[in-house]
């Protein structure tokens, strides 16, 4: 009975100590192996995100640390540290990811350099906006530290993670970041919800790094029950409307992205926050996607806990349709893991894939690599054009046109519509025809709307095609023969693999929408 008494005493005082999984904040060991496998196997569309990651200066092992700083802040006396500190923390995180993908120790050493310098130097986070600084920047840094602590150990690497690193880094998070987070939890609500969510994602991440069950439980308790706009029930309504939906869209994307990150950390630790309140995060993501695609969504004037943010009468238009890199994580959980449906988020991803960098330190970004759980996509055949504008607009540039919903279709809407895509590898010798399906063509438009361009003797030349040059199939597929076509300088179009720019210029359309479905190069007219 003494053993039973002892167990009950421990439970009543501190609860059961959690057996934490490591690495286990955003990326478990299994996830890191999966990410490396996506790159090794050249999986599409994940390689698009990887190529974007590699191109970031902060992902290079040549990155020059701009700190470390003793004091950091987002504004005020030490506001000058915001951007360089964010860059440094992103560099630690990106290089930790790159190390786990490439096994190039130079990436590992760069991440270690940044972590060690800040752990030995950083003393305090100053107002204003200290909770955001501690929450957003702290989460990125603790993810980097978690990965390096468990994947670059001293036993196997000369410059690997040491006992001293553990003590110094743990002390930094306990003494610099946690006091800000804890104070926010104790304070009466005074902010929009993204603050509390940012604080919670740092708290749950740091709790894992510190193996601190109480900190972890406090984060989950706040997520469900906190008296703040930044809890799940207070930030996302049953309809999916977000507390900041009437404010603007950037903060909504920040908030939903952070909620998904909190849920992913908990998932790696064996707790399902994704399913909380009947999959409330999914509902918020779908509402956010649907409204930003231009569809009608229900909206009610929100009564927030502070009383300061209860006067937004309609959806905030600032940032509408400007999608951040936060959609892959929730989509891959609900659709790929749980086999549920997120049709509007899928439409968003069809437009923005592959995801690139997050906004500053707000979210990690590169979700098409870091969180992709889908199948390997179709490989493009060398020299073949296959542009599906209904599913992917990556690389397309639009002049004076934007996608808007009309007649339940996403159309290009403007008084003048033109677009182009550079860097398309096209082999006209193998694919002598280009077919373009247009399901809605404005009554008034430029008749010579299709063109190809590439450099001849270092100068651009243009091959322009009119509607009269096309064979029209099935009423709305325009097929152009490229063989023998002459440029503005009389040059015959090359039959070799060529780097071309594809252009469409429909001119003044009187505001009528244009709906281009796809563009394909084909071998013959039987397709």
Predicted regions and their residues:
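Long, repeat-rich segments with strong aromatic
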Residues: 207-301
């Amino acid at each position: 009975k003494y053993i039973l008494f002892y167990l009950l005493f421990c439970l009543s005082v501190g609860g059961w100590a959690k057996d934490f999984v490591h690495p286990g904040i955003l990326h478990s060991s299994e996830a890191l192996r999966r990410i490396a496998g996506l790159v090794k196997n050249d999986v599409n569309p994940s390689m698009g995100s990887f190529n974007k990651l590699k191109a970031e200066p902060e992902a290079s092992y040549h990155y020059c640390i701009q700190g470390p700083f003793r004091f950091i802040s987002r504004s005020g006396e030490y506001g000058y540290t915001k951007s360089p500190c964010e860059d440094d923390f992103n560099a630690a995180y990106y290089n930790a990811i790159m190390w786990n993908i490439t096994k190039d120790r130079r990436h590992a050493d760069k991440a270690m350099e940044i972590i060690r310098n800040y752990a030995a130097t950083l003393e305090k986070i100053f107002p204003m906006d200290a909770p955001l600084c501690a929450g957003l920047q702290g989460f990125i840094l603790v993810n980097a530290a978690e990965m390096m602590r468990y994947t670059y150990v001293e036993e196997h690497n000369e410059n690997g993670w040491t006992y001293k690193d553990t003590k110094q880094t743990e002390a930094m998070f306990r003494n610099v970041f946690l006091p800000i987070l804890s104070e926010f939890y104790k304070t009466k609500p005074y902010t929009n919800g993204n603050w509390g969510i940012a604080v919670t994602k740092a708290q749950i991440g740091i709790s894992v790094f510190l193996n601190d069950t109480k900190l972890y439980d406090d984060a989950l308790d706040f997520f469900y029950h906190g008296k703040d706009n930044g809890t799940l029930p207070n930030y996302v309504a049953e309809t999916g409307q977000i507390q900041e939906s009437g404010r603007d869209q950037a903060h909504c994307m920040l908030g939903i992205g952070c909620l998904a990150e909190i849920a992913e950390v908990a998932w790696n630790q064996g707790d399902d926050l994704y399913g909380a309140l009947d999959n409330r995060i999914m509902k918020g993501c779908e509402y956010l996607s649907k409204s930003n695609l231009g569809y009608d969504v229900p909206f009610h004037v929100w009564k927030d806990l502070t009383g300061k943010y209860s006067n937004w009468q309609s959806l905030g238009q600032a940032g509408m349709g400007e999608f951040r890199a936060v959609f892959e994580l929730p989509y891959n959980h609900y659709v790929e893991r749980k086999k549920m449906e997120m049709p509007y988020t899928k439409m968003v991803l069809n437009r923005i894939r592959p995801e690139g960098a997050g906004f500053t330190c707000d979210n990690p970004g590169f979700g098409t690599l870091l969180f992709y759980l889908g199948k390997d996509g179709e490989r493009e055949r060398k020299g073949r054009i296959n542009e599906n504008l209904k599913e992917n607009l990556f690389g397309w540039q639009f002049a004076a046109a934007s996608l808007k919903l009309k007649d339940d279709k996403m159309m290009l809407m403007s008084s003048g519509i033109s677009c182009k895509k550079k860097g398309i590898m096209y082999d006209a010798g193998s694919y002598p025809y280009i077919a373009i399906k247009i399901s809605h063509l404005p009554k008034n438009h430029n008749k010579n709307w299709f063109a190809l361009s590439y450099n001849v003797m270092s100068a651009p030349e243009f091959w322009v095609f009119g509607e009269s040059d096309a064979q029209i199939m099935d009423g709305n597929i325009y097929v152009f023969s490229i063989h023998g076509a002459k440029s503005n300088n009389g040059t015959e179009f090359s039959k070799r693999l060529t780097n071309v720019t594809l252009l469409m210029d429909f001119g003044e359309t009187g505001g009528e929408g244009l709906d281009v479905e796809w563009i394909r190069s084909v071998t013959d007219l039987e397709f």
